[in-house]
């Protein structure tokens, strides 16, 4: 599971993982709305699609609203000591929602971005 920004991380990592295990599911995370505050992620339907991105490769896409992404980013910092970007908060929120649907399995979430460059922005300014 990874956020969809340029598409490079989810496409490259996903393709390589499928070589090792064709049954693995590749799940993308993107903002629920065109106008959002989740840095690093694209709302694909309203954006110019990056050339590397192939929507048909994904097994599923989970849409996340801005506030839950911000809240999860704050929780990562407060509870786990992980300074991550908002796209990471969105991806973790989506993973936890997915986990509620599963009886068993393993969910791997890619955190591609640190939070140091966002310290003066939401969600960190409220910490």
Map each language-model feature to its residues.
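Generic hydrophobic alpha-helical scaffold/packing signal
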Residues: 14, 61-62, 74, 96, ...
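Short beta-strand segments
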Residues: 2-5, 28-30, 108-112
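Phosphate-binding loop/pocket of nucleotide- and phosphate-handling active sites
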Residues: 96-127
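Active-site/ligand-binding loops adjacent to catalytic centers
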Residues: 18-86, 101, 122-127
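Short glycine/serine/threonine-rich phosphate/pyrophosphate-binding segments
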Residues: 3-14, 87-95, 118
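Conserved acidic residues
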Residues: 1, 59, 105
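Glycine-rich ThDP/TPP pyrophosphate-binding loop and its adjacent helix/strand module
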Residues: 1-24, 100
């Amino acid at each position: 599971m990874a956020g969809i920004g340029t598409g490079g991380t989810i496409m490259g990592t996903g393709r390589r993982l499928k070589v090792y295990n064709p049954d693995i599911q590749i799940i993308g995370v993107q903002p629920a709305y065109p106008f959002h505050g989740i840095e690093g992620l694209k709302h694909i339907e309203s954006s110019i699609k990056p050339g590397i991105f192939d929507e048909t490769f994904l097994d599923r896409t989970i849409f996340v609203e801005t506030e839950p992404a911000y809240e999860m980013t704050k929780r990562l910092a407060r509870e786990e000591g992980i300074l991550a970007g908002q796209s990471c908060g969105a991806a973790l929120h989506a993973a936890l929602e997915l986990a509620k649907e599963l009886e068993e399995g393993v969910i791997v979430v890619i955190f591609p971005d640190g939070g140091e460059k966002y310290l003066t922005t939401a969600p960190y300014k409220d910490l």
